[in-house]
Swiss-Prot record:
<dbReference type="Pfam" id="PF15171">
    <property type="entry name" value="Spexin"/>
</dbReference>
<keyword id="KW-0732">Signal</keyword>
<feature type="signal peptide">
    <location>
        <begin position="1"/>
        <end position="22"/>
    </location>
</feature>
<keyword id="KW-0372">Hormone</keyword>
<keyword id="KW-0964">Secreted</keyword>
<protein>
    <recommendedName>
        <fullName>Spexin prohormone 2</fullName>
    </recommendedName>
</protein>
<dbReference type="InterPro" id="IPR028126">
    <property type="entry name" value="Spexin"/>
</dbReference>
<comment type="similarity">
    <text>Belongs to the spexin family.</text>
</comment>
<feature type="propeptide">
    <location>
        <begin position="23"/>
        <end position="30"/>
    </location>
</feature>
<dbReference type="GO" id="GO:0005576">
    <property type="term" value="C:extracellular region"/>
</dbReference>
<feature type="propeptide">
    <location>
        <begin position="45"/>
        <end position="70"/>
    </location>
</feature>
<dbReference type="GO" id="GO:0005184">
    <property type="term" value="F:neuropeptide hormone activity"/>
</dbReference>
Length: 70
């Protein structure tokens, strides 16, 4: 009975070590170039809420959702 438990734990340990090495090889870091960054930004560019500027809001006429989304 003790030998079966020892074999089982050895097998589990071996599988965990093997699996951990496989995961590290598959998660390679990528170097994002400028073209890739443009693709990731999408059609509308960066998405941020600008500082509150009354001149910007009054000239644009977009006081609702567009100002929030941009």
């Amino acid at each position: 009975m003790i030998s079966r438990v020892w074999i089982l734990w050895t097998l589990v340990l071996f599988l965990l070590v093997t699996e951990s090495h496989c995961i590290q090889k598959s998660s390679l870091s990528k170097n994002w170039g400028p073209q890739s960054m443009l693709y990731l930004k999408g059609k509308h560019g960066r998405r941020f809420v600008p500082d509150i500027d009354d001149h910007f809001i009054s000239n644009s006429g977009l006081k609702s959702w567009y100002a929030v989304f941009k």
